[in-house]
Amino acid sequence: MKAVIFIMDGLGDRPNKDGNTPLKEAKTPVMDKMAKEGICGLMNAVDIGVRPGSDTAHLAILGYDPYTTYTGRGPFEACGVGVTVKPGDIAFRCNFSTVDENFTVMDRRAGRIENTLELEKELDGLKIDDVDIIFKESGGYRAALVLRGPGLSDKISDADPKKEGKKVKDINPLDDSKEAKKTAEIVNKLLKIAYEKLDKHPVNEERRKQNLPVANMIVPRGVGQVPEIMQFTEKTGLKGACIAGTGLIKGIAKMVGLDVIDVEGCDGTPNSDFMAKAFAIVKTLEDYDFILVNVKGADEAGHDGNYELKKEIIERIDGMLDYITKNINKDEVYIAMSGDHSTPIEEMDHSADPLPIVIWGKSVRVDDVEKFDEFSTYKGGLNWIKGTNIMPILMDLMSIAKKYGA
């Protein structure tokens, strides 16, 4: 038996004034068919009432306790874009952002700039005091930053003010150690250098001519040291792969030992080639026991408050599932389908609202649920579970779970 965990990033939502969500209103005949043929329920990736990041959510969904394995998003982001992180490295995720001359943030995502490779070159390879700067763009406005050198610490604050109209925050040490103080000073120096190098860069001068937000600042957050994590194959006995478009999810996969399958045209944006990803899933199942799949577009739409786009993306994902379910053997493959978190249109951010989940395959106890949405699956046989329950349930269905006790 094989298994797929199919995650629609940012899937869940809250009802609008008409009582609808993008998922409830979307035309999703395949998801609904899977709900009718599967066992359904509700799922909180980390815990009830906890707003998860995509990082902690995916760790939990893969069966890892995020409270003991998560050190910050930075190491995963860096790993996902190909940086070989080492013990002692301090890693951050970053946004390219638009700031004024006072470092007040005008656009947190620099107008969702698409190509930042030339800007990356201005920062990657710098050396500040005795610390090497490794900087890699990770798709659009996202990037990863790694500090490598002696005497560093991850006990420092973030620069992200979280909202536009506020200044980029000074980095401060969070304890009294000389390592934290040194690291904070290095990052503060880097931010000043970044503004000086990026503000008048030809890429940004051209964006000004087009009245587009410039990418003249990097805003580090999610600092962390590289965690020690048991490898997925050792933990489960399964040969695992990951198909995802974003650097963060690829980084999590690499960190736990999943093979990352790159799919041309899949970059983690709403414009990704969803069907190419569907074809890759079916093909990859020929060689692997397990696949983690992440499809990102609905989350982007939620963050932008775009109801219609989120609905459209969910319908496109349904088309993916049509191909997948028609081209795999239901007697040989289980699919656990859900989201990693809700990204409600009204919040334009992650929330703790539970997600619909269905497990589809030959030996599940089919329940009475007939539609896959936030308002229907609570009636299902899975009841209300956490993300860390998914892998044990799948392994039990696959007859590879170890017995607890005599």
From Swiss-Prot:
GO MF annotation list: metal ion binding; phosphoglycerate mutase activity
Top-level taxonomic group: Archaea
Keywords: Glycolysis, Isomerase
Listed EC numbers: 5.4.2.12
Pathway per the UniProt entry: Carbohydrate degradation; glycolysis; pyruvate from D-glyceraldehyde 3-phosphate: step 3/5
Gene Ontology biological-process annotations: glycolytic process
Enzymatic reactions: (2R)-2-phosphoglycerate = (2R)-3-phosphoglycerate
Keyword Isomerase annotated: yes
Pfam families, per the entry: Metalloenzyme (PF01676), PhosphMutase (PF10143)
Protein family membership: Belongs to the BPG-independent phosphoglycerate mutase family. A-PGAM subfamily.
Protein function: Catalyzes the interconversion of 2-phosphoglycerate and 3-phosphoglycerate.
HAMAP family on file: ApgM_A
Record's protein name: 2,3-bisphosphoglycerate-independent phosphoglycerate mutase
Gene assigned in the entry: apgM
